């Protein structure tokens, strides 16, 4: 069945925004910690005359027989096969399909094989135009979003979130990051560093129509580097103090050089900071482009947060060029020694648009037998420098099991009783128990090796991540 755009001219439409997901753990889980911002942000930008729903495939079932007129699909590379499967099914049912997100930006020609229209880059500047064009039967194949000032960003549609998310108030105050880590797409996707007006951010924080007290109390900043603009963040934090919230975000370790900032973070209710530590090896840090990280300083920097009762979440990447199976397994002990409260453990994934991808292409190290579903942070998509792909996968899983063993979980929780304030201790304990339960029930990250779920899609549409055709590298 072909869709007929003329049907939609000059009338209100039903729009489904689907945040595409492929399960990353063996058994999945019914409750997730924090929702993505994209869907409820786009919903807030949608003209009021239209009816919009946001479906998070991470926690909700996608209805292929939806009554929606327009289907919007947003996805990362690891979820591209599922996005294309959904798009194919929706087009059979006569729906207008639109795709956007990081993967579409870096693989536009590929995406256009499955949808009617794509958004490249940031979507705010073209979002309203898309629906005007649908009404006029002039929908374009491509819309190029510009990196516009963040002065008119509305409060997200929190009312459209499903109940399965533990934290619900997700906020963005800034966009971009001044650093250029080799594995990160942010410098290309979100160029420059931009800030929203402080009062607009405070309006989001004041939104309080949530069921549970911790949802009304907690703010999760979905910023890539919230503290990069020091005058801005200090003013925001001063304004947040009277609101008496708990908040978490991501920042660079260089914040520990600024005691005034750390004190403001404490006074405004910070309970957790995520640092991208990535590695304990100098060669691996150089491979990651993490010039700002100094291994000898890790413990002292984390202590400065603990001295203020703030929890430290930290990301570690396995598979950088300096890594060996032994160094990866050793990270379980090393992250304990420096005082990390909640570790996040991933495998290097060379996404299109990153220097890692270009490097792997140039050295012929991308694995040519794998589809996009492997690009989810938990599978090996390239040939490592000092081990085989199988050795890297095993070392990562050994690290994961060790870091989330019951002994490690309760050591971290026990330490938090003496180093963290109440909100930080509670949040870090919940996160640790969340992952500890996974380890206890063998709910590990899925290894896609040997699985055929998306084989037919790969064969049909020739999704080849390593292809130079139509790629931005």
Swiss-Prot record:
Domain (B12-binding) ranges: 1-141
Q: Which cofactor does it need?
A: [4Fe-4S] cluster
Give the EC number(s) under which this enzyme is classified: 2.1.1.-
Any idea which UniProt keywords this protein has? 4Fe-4S, Iron, Iron-sulfur, Metal-binding, Methyltransferase, S-adenosyl-L-methionine, Transferase
Q: Where is the Radical SAM core domain?
A: 163-391
CDD domains per the UniProt record, alphabetical = radical_SAM_B12_BD (cd02068)
Per UniProt, the enzyme's principal EC class comes to transferase
Transmembrane ranges, per UniProt, are none
- Record's cofactor remark: Binds 1 [4Fe-4S] cluster. The cluster is coordinated with 3 cysteines and an exchangeable S-adenosyl-L-methionine.
Q: Name one Pfam family in it.
A: Radical_SAM
In its UniProt record, which GO terms are filed under biological process? methylation
A GO molecular function for this record? Answer: cobalamin binding
Gene3D superfamilies attached to this UniProt entry: Cobalamin-binding domain, tm_1862 like domain
Q: Under which name does UniProt file this protein? A: Uncharacterized methyltransferase slr0309
């Amino acid at each position: 069945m072909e869709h007929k755009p003329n049907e939609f001219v000059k009338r209100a439409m039903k729009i489904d925004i689907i945040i595409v997901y492929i399960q990353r753990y063996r058994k999945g889980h019914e409750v997730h910690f924090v929702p993505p911002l994209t869907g409820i942000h786009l919903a807030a930008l949608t003209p009021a005359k239209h009816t919009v729903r946001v479906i998070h495939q991470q926690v909700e079932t996608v209805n292929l027989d939806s009554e929606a007129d327009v289907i919007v699909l947003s996805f990362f590379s690891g979820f591209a096969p599922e996005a294309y499967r959904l798009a194919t099914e929706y087009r059979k049912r006569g729906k207008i399909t639109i795709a956007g997100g990081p993967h579409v930006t870096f693989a536009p020609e590929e995406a256009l094989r499955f949808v009617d229209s794509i958004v490249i880059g940031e979507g705010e500047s073209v979002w309203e135009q898309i629906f005007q064009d649908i009404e006029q039967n002039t929908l374009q194949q491509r819309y190029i979003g510009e990196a516009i000032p963040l002065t008119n960003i509305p409060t997200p549609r929190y009312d459209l979130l499903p109940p399965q998310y533990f934290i619900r108030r997700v906020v963005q105050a800034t966009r971009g990051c001044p650093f250029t880590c080799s594995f990160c797409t942010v410098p290309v996707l979100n160029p420059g560093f931009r800030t929203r007006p402080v009062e607009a951010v405070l309006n989001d924080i004041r939104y309080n129509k949530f069921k549970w007290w911790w949802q009304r109390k907690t703010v999760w900043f979905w910023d890539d580097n919230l503290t990069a603009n020091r005058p801005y963040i200090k003013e925001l934090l001063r304004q947040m103090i009277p609101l008496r919230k708990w908040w978490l975000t991501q920042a660079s370790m260089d914040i520990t050089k600024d005691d005034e900032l750390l004190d403001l973070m404490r006074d405004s209710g910070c309970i957790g900071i995520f640092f991208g530590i990535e590695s304990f090896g100098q060669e691996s840090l150089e491979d990651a482009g993490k010039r700002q990280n100094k291994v000898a300083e890790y413990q002292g920097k984390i202590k400065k947060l603990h001295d203020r009762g703030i929890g430290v979440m930290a990301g570690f990447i396995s598979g950088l060029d300096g890594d060996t199976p032994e160094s990866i397994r050793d990270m379980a002990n090393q992250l304990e020694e420096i005082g990390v409260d909640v570790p996040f453990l991933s495998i290097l994934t060379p996404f299109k648009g990153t220097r890692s991808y270009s490097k792997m292409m140039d050295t012929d190290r991308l694995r040519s037998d794998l589809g996009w579903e492997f690009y989810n942070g938990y599978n090996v998509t390239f040939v490592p420098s000092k081990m085989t792909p199988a050795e890297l996968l095993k070392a990562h899983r050994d690290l994961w099991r060790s870091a989330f063993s019951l002994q490690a979980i309760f050591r971290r929780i026990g330490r938090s009783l003496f180093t963290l304030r109440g909100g930080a201790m509670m949040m870090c304990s919940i996160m640790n128990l969340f992952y500890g339960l996974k380890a206890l029930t063998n709910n590990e990250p899925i290894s896609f090796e040997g699985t055929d779920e998306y084989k037919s899609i790969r064969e049909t549409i020739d999704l080849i991540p390593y292809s130079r055709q139509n790629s931005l590298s």
